[in-house]
UniProtKB/Swiss-Prot annotation:
Region of interest called Disordered, as start-end residue ranges on this chain: 1-21
Protein name: Large ribosomal subunit protein bL27
InterPro entries per UniProt: Ribosomal_bL27, Ribosomal_bL27_CS
Domain of life: Bacteria
Family: Belongs to the bacterial ribosomal protein bL27 family.
Gene name per UniProt: rpmA
Amino acid sequence: MAHKKAGGSSRNGRDSESKRLGVKKFGGEAVLAGNIIVRQRGTKWHPGANVGLGKDHTIFATTNGSVSFRTKANGRTYVSVDPIAEAAE
């Protein structure tokens, strides 16, 4: 009798875990100092005023305010935080 042995399992069925990259706070949203604004690989968005750049290129707020995205003449998009004028107590 002609029989064919089992061929083994498929070589597919693996995938990497998603990294949850992207914009976390959009333009006009209020942020607190330390809030993450963008998670990225490389500098798709560049740091502007009142933001910091982490070693993994994460852009985060250094002051309280609202997020703004601006594209300059060089074609780069800069992320800034416009500080809110706090009322004197």
